[in-house]
Amino acid sequence: NTWTVCLVLVTGCASLSSWTPDLPGLAMLSPSENIEPLPTPEPTSGEQERSSGFSLANFIERFKDKPELDLSAGHQAFEKAETVFHAKDYLKAEDAFHDLSKKYVDTPIEEDAIFMKAECQFLTQRYPKAQDSYETMLQKYEGSRHLDKVSRRMFAISREWLKSVFSSSDPKGYSLPVPNFFDKSKPLLDLHGRALEALTSIRLHDPSGPLADDALMMTATYHFLIKKYEQADFYFQALRQDYPNSEHQSVAHLLGVRSKIHSYQGPEYDGQQLEQTEKLIHSTIRQFPDLKEHRRNLVRTLASVRLEKARRLWETANYYRRSGHPQSAQLYDVQLTKRFPDTKWAALAQTQLDESKKQVPTLANRFFSSFQ
């Protein structure tokens, strides 16, 4: 399963910003084989979740130093709560699991109870509460045996909350600042921010899991779609560096190029983005020779970057000319003619150099005449 991104070139335009992405809908941006469908996935048996690692004998042995707790009674209460869960009385089961999590603190019962409480909230489509409960469990029980399931749930929640961005032809990077008092499947405020928090949680708590790179890719693409290109560049770069074997590598390279281009602010500002873009384009062409349909776009963008680097030298030379430092201007003119001799900026620089040569005798005469 791969994410498909089509990059097209705007006909007749060779500027740095001409190559724009035509991104797919949210359905194509999801590893669907790992994610339960929303809004109402089938409930997963609590017994199945527990059977992977639960042993009553080991359970009691681990916590026999807590004489104040009747762990056997806790286990029996948990099984009763599971029975209610299987009967799909999720609200009643949620209350039971909540009570167990408060009574059996710092025991495996607490871990399982918090997880099952979150499952009840998820299956009743109260996703903000479910997110909070999943996060509580992950914070306290790092490396939980429920981690894989929790990651899939968190990803599903994020995908649901961000679907308006990924399906829109003109996505907005914000939700209306109106509190949500009626839809319990969405948070009170900051819908997109909560979705990004869930994606971040996946990467922090399960960095080597099957959804870590998917979460990072969705985060990067979200920022790209809402035109926050510096943030998008940061996340695409993180994906390229942290997940070299990810199926999203080629797309992260292509959209990384676009993010860097859009982040460039012009010759008056730092030109580091141009250098990084040039390196990334070369890396993309070298690592992904099969991207033949994008090669022409990459080559044209590379040429545009080269022209912009030449323009930066020309603008710098002009700055020194205007500020009364002709010798410094000449240094940049010479550098421009040597590095980019086939550009119009080099031709302009050469004209300036020729003019400066004509002025040398005049300047010398003025110098000696000052002593007469």
Regions found by a protein language model. Give the residues of each.
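Bacterial N-terminal signal peptides
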Residues: 1-12
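Acidic, polar-rich low-complexity tracts and alpha-helical solenoid repeat scaffolds
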Residues: 13-372
